[in-house]
Amino acid sequence: VKIKSVKFEKTYYRYFEPFTISLGTHEDQENIEVRLELEDGTVGLGEASTLFVISGETVEIMMQAEKTVQEMIVKEDVESYGKLFSRLQQLRATPAIKAAVEFAIIDAFCKRIGIRPYQFFGGAKDHIETDLTVGIMDLEKTLKKVKKIYEDGFRVIKIKVGKNFKEDVERVVESKKIAPQAMFVVDANQGFTPKEAIEFANILHSERVEVVVYEQPVNRYNIEGLKLVRFNSPYPVAADESVFTKYDALRLIKEEAVDFINIKLMKSGVSDALAIVHLAQSAGVQLMIGCMGESSLGINQSIHFAAGTGAFAYHDLDAHLSLDEKTFRGDFRQEGPHIYL
């Protein structure tokens, strides 16, 4: 069955509260919804979501890719998705669009043959567990938020750091007292020098904070710095912003720079994300999966990918919970940290 049309539409969401990371503060989120229709009327949906400070993409840049995408895939057979994915590799400047279009193709294909996307990816699991993220905020607000997250049943709590060393130490250490059985993902979003990153980790370790992933402590291009932190930190170190493509992943694996890679469909697209899964599994590097500013429609893509591959030790798929959405549009059910397909 041939693809009849593909259209992009801008969508806009407000955050329930301003979301701050070491790279800046966000109060709203503009995404792009991709709607792909087959000649038999079957519709596949995808969503592109990005943060300019991380990927360099803007909504305007992404919208400009619409005509290019139409020329690449309209009038082509949806069953030949491998051929279409190869063409979409040309969208190097807009990986989030590549992800959304690839997923829309998969969504339409799955509806055609009567399966769900997680089954397309392998059907490894039909249930995953996510963490919940605490942005950079003052100590009092941090602890109030951590207490609520912990009481809501989340076993893994992600805390953003990297803006103020002393305050960040206090926020994480005090959070552990509020949530004594919780495991923590600590994400600096490139906010530290290697020396600071090592010192930060050692202080937390001396306070017996259980950090299961220490995410992107240093600048994304500082691979030597990442490696230095990895070999001098008591915690497993993850690359996030350092890995967009399968080639980035291969380089980090060869350099032995990280324990974990954080895959985001919005950085890699579906096809490169699958390649990174296989690379990491071959090399014994662990995986987590994260998100940008997706609504329930966009986070749905990563949930199906994560459950279907069953490849991830930790899931950070919580962006939709921070956005003021009028309508829930995911093909999943969520109870606290538990996501069911």
At which residue positions do the language-model features occur?
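Structured beta-strand/loop patches that form or line metal/cofactor-binding pockets in enzymes
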Residues: 1-45, 49-52, 325
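Metal- or metallocofactor-binding catalytic centers and their adjacent structured scaffolds
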Residues: 3, 37-112
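Flexible C-terminal active-site loop/helix
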Residues: 4-15, 31, 292-341
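N-terminal small/glycine-rich loop or linker at the start of catalytic domains
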Residues: 111-136
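Active-site beta->alpha loop and helix N-cap motifs at the rims of alpha/beta catalytic domains
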Residues: 115, 134-143, 148, 165, ...
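Active-site mouth loops of central-metabolism enzymes
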Residues: 127-141, 161-162, 193-194, 238
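Catalytic core of soluble alpha/beta enzymes
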Residues: 159-292, 296-298, 325-334
